[in-house]
Amino acid sequence: MGAGQSTRSSLNKSSPEELSHVLAHRFASKCFTPLELTHFKDNFNSRALDENGLRHWNEEILSQFLGIPDGAGEKAGPHTDATLDAGPVIFRMVSYLGAFPFQNTLAPSVLTYEAIIKVVVLLTERYGRVLRRGRKDRIKLLFGSLADVGRTQVEEKEMPVQESNDGKANGIAKGNPSHVTGFAIDAPANDDEEEEDDDDDLALAALESLDAIEVFKHDQRIDRSVYKARVSIDTFRRLIALILVIAPLHPIGTTSKLIADQDAESIDAIQAQVDSIIAAFGEEADNDGITYKSFSRVLRTSLPFLFDPLTPLFEHFLFSKNLDLSRRKESRSTEPEHEKSSSTPPPHSPHSESVFLPGPFESNILNTALLSHLSFFLSTSYPLPNLFRNGTRLHPVFSSVYHGESLTAFSHHVLTWHAPSILLLKGVTDSSSSRQDTVLVGAYLPEPWKQSSTTSSDHASDYLDSSKFPCLFQLLPTHTVLLASPFFKTLKFNMPVASFSTKSGIALGCMIPPSSRTSLHHDLRPRPAGGGSLIIDPALENATFVVSDGLNGDGVFLPPGLSPSSSSSFSASALSSTTSISVHAIEVWGVVPTQPELGPVLDPDSSRGDAVAAQKAAWDFEAREAERRRTIHLKVGGGDSEEQTGRALLEMAGIIGDSNYSPRKH
């Protein structure tokens, strides 16, 4: 017991640099396996620079290792695309995160072994193995690594005030003037934002694990009110462009290959998605940058998986080509020339397979950039929601370009798909002005179209599984996500998630008026309800996308920026924005979540995995029935008289004609 108190006392007297060093080694021992740590050390030591005994990485080494473009590097040339030039942004983030949990006083940090250890732990979310109180929430930490902030300057006149509060902490600061002064982004703010009160949970948990809370309090004592921290639009734009490209990346994948595959058309598609995501931050995107309040709100409600691709990117540190055991085994049993061909990482991985399953048509809407955009917010499985991480596959179900603009064709293909699906609609704004903007809207539907969502079972686990909740979204021109109401399963029967008929067309999130003999045609039109809705006319030529500013009565979807957990605090509003769309294409993609990493135990609904086979069986049955109905056996008896009687009956029924009648068999 005495030894424990002595250790706690010595840690409280340690400098931030010493505590940061201790935390890094605790991360290394608790968050990595011995094999992973061996690979990490080899990657670091084989590339590190040595300056007066200090081994570290610089920006160029980091960018080359991660395989990301770096305009500041020696290999930058005239053909280097500035859109994907995220090397300086990543280096800036890493330099900030390497100072954790003392970003105020130690950032930007030199990329030493200890600093990069902490960066990898934070960006791969492995800190839960050490920081029990730490929320799995990196939003503020990531904001701080991206924000443009002034350097903290603690003037002498502020010191007496600080000493009156905690002389011991200031004594540590005075006794250690050698470290560089850091950023002010994580200092306590003089604001009334409730959600920022616990934003330092990760840092607090880190210092609690070291029994060094007093040092942490000193690091957080600098007033942030004089700093207007914002994320530069240019900085954020370059980061989003990179994340869109590397979204399909897996830990042993090749980042440089994903980037090299981008041609001019792909770059244009990426820029369109970047503009859409930036526009989601509202007027701030056109002014001085993005504030923390907007950054946190948008990421929490409509882009929860935006930074997921950084996890496999930084897991590259845990795989060294020099220590690849598979290469060594091959080199012993093959010729020397084969050894060269085995220098690439293992090509087989569930994440490297194509997301698109083979089918009758290729998409006129979906591309790689759009698929990456969908992965930033769409939850297709549980507990791994990201469609690139959980092995989700998309099966082509319906295309208006391929199958025709007909509700009959739509129902034939959609009603035979008994699994979750994604509806996508692309068109242009139908306005009187000469300018027509491209519009792309869609919806994720966890239940088959044939079954009403109001009849689905309501299990307690469904509230934890976001893949069981529908959502309505817009990808162009502005990223918008309308999450499902937590009570959407208990709504009245006339408020289904999705419905369609030959009279009213396709309706998502609408109230469907009851039909009767006295009802006029306009009385049967679906009516927008809740936070938003999508209505497509029966001809599949025009659509209406409605987004409400508040809760417009009961409805399936919530307004943008509102999550199910906070829906009760949102005020009602009758104001809404309506976008009229001239439809160019409609597609429905079946979601086939296959989780090879987790096995079928976590996904007991095996019918979802067999949806492709079930649809094919249904179509084969329909084809056999159609052929059977076309083949009419005229010989109903043993002689010609019975055959003639059967023919006469069929003629009277109007099924066949008598122009080619002959008593003989053909």
UniProtKB/Swiss-Prot annotation:
Report the protein's function: May be involved in a process influencing telomere capping.
Q: Where in the cell is it found?
A: Cytoplasm
Alphabetically ordered keywords of this record:
Cytoplasm
InterPro entries assigned to the protein according to its UniProt record, in alphabetical order: TLDc_dom
Which stretches does the entry tag as region Disordered? 329-354
Which residue range or ranges hold the TLDc domain?
364-592
Q: What is this protein called?
A: Restriction of telomere capping protein 5
The protein's predominant localisation is cytoplasm
SMART domains given for it?
TLDc
Instruction: Please give the GO cellular component terms listed in this UniProt entry.
Output: cytoplasm
Q: Which family does it belong to?
A: Belongs to the RTC5 family.
Question: Which ranges are annotated Basic and acidic residues under compositional bias?
Answer: 329-341
One Pfam match, given by its short name, reads TLD
